[in-house]
Amino acid sequence: MKVLVLNASPRRKGNISQMVGVMKDEAESNGAEVEVVDVQHLDIRPCVACMKCRSTGFCVMPEDDSQRVLAKIQEADAVVVAAPCYWGNMPGTLKLLFDRIVYGLMDESSVGFPKPLLKGKRCVLVSTSTTPWPFNILMHQSHGAIRAMKEICRYSGFKIVATVEKGGTKRNTLLSEKEEKRCRKAARRLLS
């Protein structure tokens, strides 16, 4: 099984990277082939909203990393989307990627309803927030990022098999044993 991890955290040793590392190790120990893409290192131009991709099925802008990542998503059996919460949402770098590859994630029916193009692929969503638990949930911080990623993944046809959220990352810079266990469990659900 091929698993693609989209890591949208700019922090190489932060909580998201640690969580992704645990999931990667668990998936590989269960026979999966895992590739991690660090979204913050991608060279992607912003979408210009020309809407040509909706009728042509490809982006007319010059090729950049967005097309290469889309090909990896299409080849993968499962995807982990991991992002810290920025202002109750996903980071701009991840949103930029999703904006540019919308044509490969979903189409439209003849009456304009979304038509998923990635049906059958499994997905795990991961988010962190500096807002301490349980306020990160009550104030819709990390949950806001999960909500935004969930909307994109659902319209694309992914079956979301798990979500993992962690609050209070400003003070809790390392994963607890319980958090590592949740990450391993999510990785196993991705493979089953």
What are these regions (language model features)?
Residues D43-L70:
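Cysteine-cluster motifs in flexible loop/terminal segments that predominantly coordinate metals
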Residues A8, N30, M139, H143-S192:
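Glycine-rich phosphate/pyrophosphate-binding loop and the adjoining helix
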Residues V39-H41, T128, K166:
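Active-site loop/turn elements of alpha/beta-hydrolase fold enzymes
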Residues Q18-G21, A49-K52, L94-L97, L138-Q141, ...:
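Short, glycine/charged-enriched secondary-structure capping and boundary segments
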Residues E33-D43:
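A short beta-strand-loop structural module common to alpha/beta enzyme folds
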Residues P62-K150:
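Helix-loop-strand module that forms the ligand-binding subsite of alpha/beta enzymes
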Residues M1-A32, P132, G167:
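N-terminal beta1-alpha1 ligand-phosphate binding loop
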